UniProtKB/Swiss-Prot annotation:
This is Probable monogalactosyldiacylglycerol synthase, chloroplastic. It catalyses: a 1,2-diacyl-sn-glycerol + UDP-alpha-D-galactose = a 1,2-diacyl-3-O-(beta-D-galactosyl)-sn-glycerol + UDP + H(+). Involved in the synthesis of the major structural component of photosynthetic membranes. PANTHER family: MONOGALACTOSYLDIACYLGLYCEROL SYNTHASE, MONOGALACTOSYLDIACYLGLYCEROL SYNTHASE 1, CHLOROPLASTIC.
């Protein structure tokens, strides 16, 4: 068994502290003075989308850096109440600060030096250039389309979805597409914005801080203002990052990857040339920043998410409900349970429960494993009624503690695994937190799910999603969870079987293939040549 070193999470500062404080100041000090009759929670979310715009007129000679485009954000609010004047004054001061930074920092592709001539395979700014010569048969081949997937390692689900999409492109279209994955915030923004993943991990570990951040930034007025302010500091670096890949398709699998890139594309008139799609990786509840009206396509994992997208202003033709993209290996058949259990060192004919806590091995795994060790042992007959497969991920300390325990039942402890489809295929049910990717994979394998935790905000809706569809239960108590499993492996086996059938009905194993084929169709319909540089 391979052991992996555990990760150490430090406590960084919040890179969006300044922006959040300004947004909170605007919201708290202004909206509280506006009467409910004129400025309600139902109306303020529409204000900024109607009155926030950027004057980004780009001239043809902007590439020579003589006339750099400037972003001039202007906010104007029409509220027929005396208290509106104080609200407008605060926003005026906020806009003045943003305008100052916009004048200092050029925006968009025009601010990036691009050489469209002969480059011998190398462009300025480290651009990715492929060999597009003539093959040996003398016939010029069409260069592959370039796909850029934008993600961030804030949780494991975004990277997993990005990898699944890349694998599907490779399997379905081979060398017709070149797929690149980039962590936009870490790799293409300046400090402190490039500390986003570390800040997220810190906030999630302090649940109340994350809950406050999630819901405080949900109103459109707040997050649009935050993005407007943030863009003035990161737009140039983000533009360089996009130009590095010269993409034909941009795919966002993260809620913070829509607004800034789309603003840059719009400022350069590239929205009709570059396909921009969003693949939402939250099953039910999702943050409003997932939705942007300028996307070419928004792929929703469920009808509930599609309804949210419509309420956010997207049009029906922009939406496709295909399911959550999971790795293509989950679509392929796996060997029978007996064979998989033998390969994993498990008992071949004993019911098995899979216990996991994500890539970092988070959650009450040890307490739950010990409770299962007691509940799945028949004291009367002196024999086990079930077995446990524990996935510790990169949590080396947890791995060492569990492997040192003298168990009364068969317990297999694994570190970080890459073939999760085989681990799930070897088991009869699963205990996990409410991560959308794990839920989507579990229902494909027909596993009843016991959810033992969730992240406030984006994962909260996954609990009723599982329960209401009849494919699982929820409990935070290790003892209650162990008793549920013991019942499923004993007198309530029929309930386990019914939940397994419900899970299979909920599964969408081909979602990732439908997504990439729809993107391929968008490329075919648009029929544009890869862009060297904007005019």
């Amino acid at each position: 068994m391979m052991q992996h070193s555990s990760s150490v999470t430090q406590e960084p500062t919040n890179p969006f502290g300044f922006v959040s404080q300004v947004g909170s100041f605007v919201f708290n000090n202004s909206c509280s003075r506006v009467s409910k009759s004129n400025f309600t929670l139902d109306s303020y979310s529409n204000l900024l989308s109607n009155y926030l715009y950027f004057d980004c007129n780009v001239k043809k000679d902007s590439l020579n850096h003589k006339n750099k485009p400037k972003a001039s954000p202007l906010l104007s609010l029409s509220i027929s109440n005396k208290s509106a004047s104080s609200f407008s004054r605060v926003l005026f001061q906020f806009n003045k600060a943003i305008r100052f930074h916009c004048e200092k920092i050029p925006l968009g592709f025009a601010s990036v030096g691009v050489n469209c001539g002969e480059s011998n395979g190398v462009r300025e700014e480290g651009s990715v250039v492929e060999n597009e010569g003539i093959p040996d048969n003398g016939v010029e081949s069409e260069p592959p389309k370039k796909v850029l997937i934008l993600m961030s390692d804030t949780g494991g689900g975004h990277r997993a979805s990005a990898e699944a999409i890349r694998s599907a492109f490779n399997e379905e279209f081979g060398d017709k597409y070149q797929v690149f994955i980039t962590d936009l915030w870490t790799e293409h923004t300046p400090w402190p914005f490039n500390q986003l993943p570390r800040s997220y991990n810190f906030l999630v570990k302090h649940g109340s801080l994350w809950r406050m951040t999630y819901y405080a930034t949900a109103p459109r007025l707040v997050h649009q203002t935050n993005f407007a302010a943030t863009s003035t500091f990161i737009a140039r670096e983000v533009a360089k990052g996009l130009m590095k890949y010269q993409p034909d398709i941009i795919i966002s699998v993260h809620p913070l990857m829509q607004h800034v890139p789309l603003r840059i594309l719009r400022s350069k008139g590239l929205l009709k040339k570059i396909i921009f799609t969003t693949v939402i990786t939250d099953l039910s509840t999702c943050h409003p920043t997932w939705f942007h009206k300028l996307v070419t396509r928004c792929y929703c994992p469920s009808e509930e998410v599609a309804k949210r997208a419509l309420r956010a202003g997207l049009k029906p033709y922009q939406l496709k409900v295909y399911g959550l993209p999971v790795r293509p290996s989950f679509v392929k058949p796996v060997p029978p349970k007996v064979e998989l259990r033998k390969e994993l060192g498990m008992e071949e004919h004993l019911p098995a429960v899979l216990l996991m806590g994500g890539g970092e091995g988070m959650g009450p795994i040890e307490a739950t494993a010990r409770a299962l060790g007691d509940a799945l042992y028949d004291e009367i007959h002196g024999e086990p009624i079930g077995q446990v497969l524990v996935i510790c991920g990169r949590n080396k300390k947890l791995f060492n503690r569990l492997t040192s325990v003298q168990w009364k039942i068969p317990v297999q402890v694994k570190g970080f695994v890459t073939k999760m489809e085989e681990c799930m295929g070897a088991c009869d049910c699963i205990i996990t937190k409410a991560g959308p990717g794990t839920i989507a994979e579990a229902v494909i394998r027909g596993l009843p799910i016991i959810l033992n935790d969730y992240i406030a905000g984006q994962e909260a809706g996954n609990v009723p999603y599982v329960i209401e569809n009849g494919c699982g239960k929820f409990s935070k108590s290790p003892k209650k969870i162990a008793n549920i499993v013991a019942q499923w492996f004993g007198p309530r086996q029929d309930e386990l079987r019914i939940m397994s059938q419900n899970a299979l009905r909920l599964a969408r194993p081909d979602a990732v293939f439908k997504i990439v084929h729809d993107m391929h169709e968008l490329v075919r319909q648009r029929n544009f040549e890869p862009q060297c540089c904007p005019a």
